């Protein structure tokens, strides 16, 4: 398998749809939230974490099955339903509309992979093993995360900062526990 090209896109204020509301869908939503996407989750049953995010106004929740047309106007889609047929229908709609989609149960239908994410302030790194080894990608992302922390701390300890006025040790956007865990 050839490696995927890493690309970083702005999701700020743009619509993203997540089909499904189980553990994988929840991880995907939590990976997308820090990047400003307007996230709609579509699923008949919803996990507690997503319920809470909806109550806090951080995501929009539609408690119903996925239906044709749900991906209209979105810039990014994730299908992580616990139903192969639903995921396949979402893939077909995304493909027809030219919408990038990650399909949790079928890497062949995914047009992108969720990377392991490492973030410290404005520095963001994504790690993938091209869908071949999720554990390797997760471990590599943890190593990159640690390197970024050390890099930022070293710069700050040497007075190199692009953020005057920020309290030492206060780095907005750091990601101590982002797993993003590469998967479809």
Language-model region placement:
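Glycine-rich, highly charged phosphate/nucleotide-binding loops
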Residues: 55-69
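ADP-ribose/adenylate-binding Rossmann-like module
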Residues: 76-81, 87-113
């Amino acid at each position: 398998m050839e490696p995927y090209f890493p690309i970083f896109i702005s999701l700020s204020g743009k619509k993203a749809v997540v089909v499904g509301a189980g553990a994988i869908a929840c991880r995907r939503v939590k990976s997308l939230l820090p990047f400003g996407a307007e996230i709609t989750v579509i699923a008949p049953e919803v996990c507690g974490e997503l319920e809470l995010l909806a109550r806090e106004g951080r995501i929009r929740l539609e408690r119903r099955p996925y239906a044709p047309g749900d991906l209209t106007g979105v810039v990014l889609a994730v299908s992580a339903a616990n139903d192969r047929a639903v995921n396949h229908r979402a893939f077909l709609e995304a493909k027809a509309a030219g919408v990038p989609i990650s399909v949790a149960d079928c890497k062949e239908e995914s047009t992108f992979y969720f990377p392991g994410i490492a973030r410290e302030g404005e520095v963001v790194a994504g790690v993938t093993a091209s869908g071949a080894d999720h554990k390797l990608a997760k471990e590599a992302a943890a190593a990159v995360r640690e390197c970024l922390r050390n890099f930022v701390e070293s710069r700050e300890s040497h007075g190199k900062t692009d953020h005057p006025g920020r309290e030492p040790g206060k780095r907005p956007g750091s990601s101590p526990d982002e797993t993003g865990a590469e998967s479809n």
